[in-house]
Amino acid sequence: KMGINVVYMLPISKFSLKDKKGDLGSPYGVSNFNELDPNLKDYLTKDSMTLDEEFEAFVEACHILNMRVMIDIIPRTNAVENDLIKDHPDWFYWIKASEYEKYKVPTVEGIGNTTLPILEYMEKVYKSEDTFRHINMFQYNPKDQNKVLWNKIKNKKNLSEEIEKKFDLRIAPAFSDSQPPWTDVTFFRMYEDFPKETKEFLDTTDRPPYILFDTIKSNMYHGEKPNIKLWEKLADIVPSYQRRFGIDGARIDMGHALPSKLLQMIISKARENDEDFSFIAEELQVSNAQFAYDAGYNMIIGNGFTM
């Protein structure tokens, strides 16, 4: 016997192939949290079982064998082409489609590529010409630009293409450090305003929302207007899988970049249904294990990738 008693799976939700990286795309580019990836359908069952029924049976079989089932949830990012855009274009960041090829991570002279964006560096970040160029690329969402036109196109099948055609807009890709932009995913707008810790460095707050090192790290930098409807949506991902399939745990992707109040919503809502529900933190530093435990996690990924 191998002694395995937990099955942990990479994301199983439906994901998008738009602007994919590589040939296969990434399951972390989730386009619909609540739908299972249709590619997971077992061809052997044909029409005798639905995909949902297959996963439900899988979880049941694991439980019969005294094995727990854990999934991966992705509440910090979403695919650049996703099912939430139609009703919530304001939950995302936008740039001009015609300037897409110019979009890149801003660099700041004197600050290393992998430096933690602590507050003492942020004034220098905002004074950088490259940062100024970067944040000026961002635009207001299409609905706010022209609500009448938005209502005409929002139900179109190829919505992303329609937005490009009618508004010259695309969702801005996510990025991290000096890596090339993550072309297939973007960040959620966790707050409806700018971070209170750094907005003093802006020339004006009368500008579109933007992605920058501080807005990415919403665990460190907070607005005063939480995007409550979005938070409630994200906090219901795990309960949805509990209700439908009876899963036993989840790893929270980029949980380290979530507002602490949202993280607590996610953890507490899951444990209202199952007090023994387990969470894995995407924490690579063993020295932060106690912090993860205090936040409600049961375990961390650890430093196995770098050993």
Show which residues each predicted segment covers.
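N-terminal small/glycine-rich loop or linker at the start of catalytic domains
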Residues: 185, 189-223
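Short acidic-aromatic active-site loops that bind/stabilize oxyanions
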Residues: 48, 220-231
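Acidic/aromatic-lined carbohydrate-recognition and catalytic surfaces
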Residues: 1-200, 257-286
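Short, acidic/polar
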Residues: 1, 226-244
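Short catalytic-loop micro-motif centered on adjacent basic/acidic residues
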Residues: 70, 249-253
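Glycan-recognition surfaces
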Residues: 199-207, 272-307
